[in-house]
Amino acid sequence: MTRIAITGIGVVAPGAVGVEAFADLLNRGETAAKPVDRFDTTGLDAHSAALVRDFAPKEFIAPMKLRRMNRLSRFGVAAARMAIADRGGELPTASGVAMGTAFGPVQTSVDYMQQYVEKGAALAPPQLFAESVANAPGSHVGIEFDLRGFNITVTQRESAALTALMYASMQIAKGVVPAAIVGGVDDVSEILFGVLDRVGALGEESRPFDRSRNGMILGEGGAALILEGAKDTPGCAYVSGFGMARDPTASISNWGEREDIVASAMQAAIEDAGLSLHNIDAIYASANSTIAADRLEYRAIQSLFREVPPVVATKGYFGEYAAGGALQLLAAILALRDQKLHASAGFSEGEPEMRFTPTLEPVTKNLQHLLVNSISAGGGVVCGVLSREAQ
């Protein structure tokens, strides 16, 4: 595919607001997961999450507009404003917006339905209903920055942000829009935390690929990227290829068992970028500290690569579903920008059949091409290749 430039980035993440603060979090190797203090977890098995703290939305959004936005929309608009500033100026009006979210505004939906039941349809606040839909954050981004191209929202669980990136990249490559804001948003609500705990999805520590892993840490946040056509456009990284597949053995609540299908999506992304396996300098993995998903991914990696390149697992820092998967993507972009692979937080010992050890320390390395994997419950697999150069 035609390479697409990433010309600006912005982030509201657990433990870090702003790109350089996020880069510092990754470089320190510290997890942002802490005991939950936003709601009571008494009676649950899990008690930790990666929450956004010290975020002041009024620094990014005018007070009158702020009142109309839920937490997800605030994450999205703030991240987009930072990305536009990082770019160095406003986008053309014809630009598009593509946002990803794993679950959308769950808490807003709960708040609206509670008032609907208690007060009736006539008295339930209409502004809450408007914010209860998954595309509210993307709509606010389009309105805030007067962007009149496409405006879509992808709800693909773990793969939401990478799928949104693929859509926007294709539209720019075809000349439909000159540029786009691409991002992801999600937040940790009491009801979502409780449901995931009840089905046994959550653990107390995020330990991707580690043999002692027993569940994911729930994360939240927002991230945004500016995409523009790569010809003569300098960027901090470039989008160069995508691959997709679906595992028919997966159910809505698991990731499936066919490592060959996951490997086929990785292979397709590499070929779409015009590259070979030996061109991939590292893999930014989808591993989320669940037994089944991590095993599926490492088996797929080992089946595709005879010599496995360095593998980085970032969700030990900020949990799963954080910004609809966009934080993992942003970490890979920063690796290319800074020419440094991050350590894999939470890993100490792998399973016996693993032929590789995820990165244990930050590694300064000549990085030209990174593979980013995203495997979602329900069987969807999206893989992308990011490159350092425009050609």
Predicted features, each with a name:
Residues 76-88, 134-137, 142-145, 151-183, ...:
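Active-site-proximal alpha-helical scaffold in enzymes
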Residues 20-25, 107-122, 173, 194-205, ...:
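A glycine- and small-aliphatic-rich helix-loop capping segment at beta-alpha/alpha-beta transitions
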Residues 176-200, 204-209, 213, 242-256, ...:
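Acyl-CoA/ACP chain-elongation machinery
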Residues 2-12, 19, 24-35, 204-275, ...:
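Condensing-enzyme catalytic core mediating Claisen C-C bond formation in acyl metabolism
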Residues 13-16, 63-81, 124-133, 151-163, ...:
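Active-site pocket-shaping loop/turn-to-helix segments
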Residues 1-6, 91-94, 235, 277-279, ...:
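Flexible, low-complexity linker/loop segments at domain and module junctions
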Residues 5-6, 21-23, 27-156, 277-295, ...:
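Conserved beta-ketoacyl condensing-enzyme motif
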Residues 118-125, 166, 170, 187-234, ...:
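Glycine-/small-residue-rich "gating" segment that lines the acyl/pantetheine channel
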